[in-house]
Amino acid sequence: MTNTIYDITHDADVILLFGSNPEEAHPVIGMQIRQAVQNGTKLIVVDPRDINLAGAASVHLKLKPGTNVAFINGMMNLIIQKGLVDKEFVENRTEGYEKLAETVREYTPEKVAEICHIRVEDLEKAAVMYARAEAAPIIYCLGVTEHSTGTQGVMSLANMAMLVGKLGKPGCGVNPLRGQNNV
């Protein structure tokens, strides 16, 4: 985890919960996420299942299973197209931006909506909400990692966090929930 549990549930404006059902698998964290939402934090749920937290979400994206990377690429494409990139962070702390931008260019909202079986409007809402938030952690679990593209999914989430400068500061980061530490 890049941030503490307290940090990502108390200092966040938006939580991006991806492929995770913390109220079932990590109940203490699930309770803290629910409390954060009750205290005004917005929640984006990306999960094909109707998990309990989806009812509290500002947007619930029920992706077709196996389309995580296409979805994240679509989010990054929108972030770039809408001018929401943290240019200073990208310039000073990353490399390969041009290659990333070239790669995600083909993942238009319409194409991603078709691939993932979601609405364009929901994809756009999630991308803008996440990118514009001052503090927004990505919290993910087995719904991301236990796929043939799990490694690419995690790397894509990290790339998206860096694209908007949400790494290395409170209430942000890329945060896996697992059964054991350092899995």
Please report, for each region that a protein language model flagged, where it lies by residue:
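Cofactor-pocket helix-loop regions in the catalytic cores of large enzyme subunits
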Residues: 1-182
